[in-house]
Each structure stands twice: as C-alpha cells, then as structure tokens.
Amino acid sequence: MINSLSIIKRITYLLFVLIFVCVIFLVNHIFNHANLPINEILIKGQYQHIDREQINLITEEYVQGNFFNLNLYEARSAFKQLPWVRDVDLRRKWPDQLVITIEEHKPIARWEGIGLVNDKGEIFIASTEENLPIFVGPENFVKEMTIKFREINKILAKELIHISIIKLSERLSWEIKTNNFIRVVLGKKNVSSRVKSFIKNYQFVLAELKSEIDYVDMRYRDGFSVRKTKKKNKDKTLNSTI
C-alpha cells in the first residue's frame, strides 16, 4: 500500500515537472517570436470589379506590425470602404501568414439610378456599365423586391421574357416593364398567379399585339385590359382563359 502511494506521488511529481517545463518552453517561444513579422499574405475570393491595386495599397498601409499585434479591425474597416467589397475576413495563420478572404457584391439590378442591388437584396453604391434591370420602390422593401424579381423572372422565362423595370408603390402595388417594352400592372395580391395569367395570354393573344401595347392591366378577376399605344384606340378588355 505504501509502495503504491509512493509510486503515485512520483508520477504526480513528474507530471507537474513536465507541465512546468512545457509552460516555460511555451512562454519562451512566444517571447522569442514577439517580433515575428507577417511574411506572407494570401488573398482569397472571386471578384470582377474590385481593383487589385486598391487591395495592394490597403495591404501595404494597414498590414503593419507582427503576427501578434497586427490590428485586424483597422485593416478590415479599410477593406470594407472599397465600393465593391461586401464583406472581408482577415485571419492569422501560424507562424507568419495573414489570410484575407474577400466577398464581392454581385449586382442584379440598379436602384433608382443612384445605386445597385446585390443578390442578397442589399443596396450598395458603386458604378458599372452593365445593362441591369431597374428597381423602383421603398428602400426598406428592397429584399422583398429582390425575391419578387426572381420569382417573376422565373415565370417570364418560359416565353424568353425578363424584367427591365420592377416597381413597388408606396401602397405596395406591383408593376413591371418587360424587355420587349410591355408594362404590366399586377396590383397588390396574387402577383404570381397574375404573372402566370399574363404569360398564358401572351402566348395566344398578346404576342401578336406586343408592338401596339402601352400596358396590360392584370388586376381583373376573370380577365385583363390592354391599352394600345395609339391614342385613337380605346382601352380593350379581353377575357382571359384562366
């Protein structure tokens, strides 16, 4: 019994010494590397609009200090100021690397001519010459507009049509203009079913009139109305085949 206790004490003592040595070694290692510089910077992410030269300038200015005292917050804030940067992640990688992962805004539309809308339904300010559809509506409904834009475009694609302008009024009434210059009034309710009705009637009725159409009003329960571009023609109401 005494021998067993003696053995346990010895093992405990040895473990204590081992832990103590490891701690001393670790502290010494950190102390000796207190001035460890960042020797390699890895840039990750796919981007088309972000200027690589701007990334390099920010890296040179803000990636200062060693592995331990590098101010990642300031560097991240600087990257976030670039027009096309949606998000950025900076991460230290032992022993001397900094990994920068950049997420670029992916534009899907213009916002009333003063900004752009990304695929997450967020408005951002940047410039591009891309031919993009236009969103017009209350700014706090941009996410809803993004969802509705995709939903309607998916239905229109059956006839190789897509949205050039989508509008949401202050009273939350929807309206679109297609790439073949047809304005479609959809109203507040049953928007998807009204778009489907528009496509169904487009195939059999509206396609032949498209060059003459000013707008199509789909807010009728069992039909729709068409206003022709020529002023001498009065509004014409057609029964849909729903």
Could you tell me what each predicted segment is?
Residues 98-184:
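Extracytoplasmic segments of membrane-associated envelope/inner-membrane machinery
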